[in-house]
Amino acid sequence: MENTIQMNLFQYFLDEEQFSIKEATDLVNNIKNMNVNNESIRARIYEGVEKGIFTKISRGVYKVTSQIEGHENTCLLVNGDGRDLSMIKDKSVDGIITDHPYDLLKSLKGGNRKFATFELFRYESRDFKEKQRVLKEGAFLVEFLPEESEVNYEYLYEIKKMAQENGLKYFAKVAWKKGTFVSNTGRKSKNMEDVMIFSNGEPRSLKLDAKKNLAVARENNIDVKGLSSYEVRDILQENNLDVYYMKGTAGMLPTVFDYQPKDSKHKIMEAEKPVELIEEIIEYISKPYETLLDQYAGSGNFVIACSNKNRNSIAIEKDNSMFEKMKNNVEKTLNVKFEEIDYEY
C-alpha cells in the first residue's frame, strides 16, 4: 500500500511542477478510490521526500534572519492559504495567535470589519485538526473572536466544540477592550473582542513556581528577600540552579486587555490588532526564541510584535494585495529587507 500511494502520486503528477497535500489526498481517495486516511498519505509523501522521489518546495515564501543577543531570529512571510498548513511539520510550532476572517455577514456591517472585502469563511473541524497537528504538546492556541451576540453565539459554541474534539483544551477567555472606541451597532454598543485561549492537551508549564524557587534559593544561601518571582528566576539562572515552573501561562491572565486600536486612516487593514496587545499575549504563551504562527496575518503586526519580543514567526496571508502591504509594513517598521526563497520543508 505504501509504495502504491507513492507510485500513484509520482505517475499522476509526473508532468506537473508541484502538487499540494490536498491534491494528493484527493487523488488517492477520490480518483484512485484507495480509502486511505490523510495521515497515512502525508506519511507516505514524507517518506517519498526522504527517498528522493519528491522534493518539498513552497514558493511565495519570504525570509529575513537577524541576530538578537547571540540567537538567530527568523521570520517567514508566506503568500498562501492559512488553512493549508501542509508546509509545516508536525509538532513544530510553539504557539498560534490568529484572527480568522469569519463569515458572519450580519455582524460585519459595523465595528472594525465594516469594510471587509477579503475572503470570509467559517471554521470547520479540519481547521482545528491542522492546528493541533502543528502545535507542540501543551502549546497554546489564541483565537481572536467577536464578542458574543445574537448572530454569532452558535458559531462561537461550535468553535469551542470543534477545538475540543481535536484535542485542544479550553484554557481561558480574556476580553480585549478597545480603549475609548465604541461601535454603536446591533442590539448593544460594543467595544470588546474576545481572546480565546486553548492548549494542545494539558497546558505547558510557563508559570513560575514561586515556592519551589524560593526554597532553592534558601537551600543555596542566596538572599532573595523582597525580590519578584522573575528576579528570583534570573538569580537562580545566573547561579546555574534549577528553576521550577507550573502548568499554565507565564503569569496570571488579566481581567481584560485594554489597548486602543489605531484610527482607521492609519490602519493597514480594518481588523488589525495593536502591536502592544499582541506583544502582551506573546509573553503569556511563549518563551524567547520560540516559533509562533499567524495563519491570517493581515497587517503584519504579529510579525512586528514577535520581532520586538525575540520570537521567530511564520505569517501567512492569502490575499496578494494585503500580502504586499504586510511585507511593506514589516520592512518599514523593522528596517529589514525580505528575500524570496524556495522554501524546502
Which residues make up each language-model segment?
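Core catalytic lobe of class I
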Residues: E2-F323
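Conserved SAM-binding loop
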Residues: M326-K327
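Class I S-adenosyl-L-methionine-dependent methyltransferase module
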Residues: E331-Y345
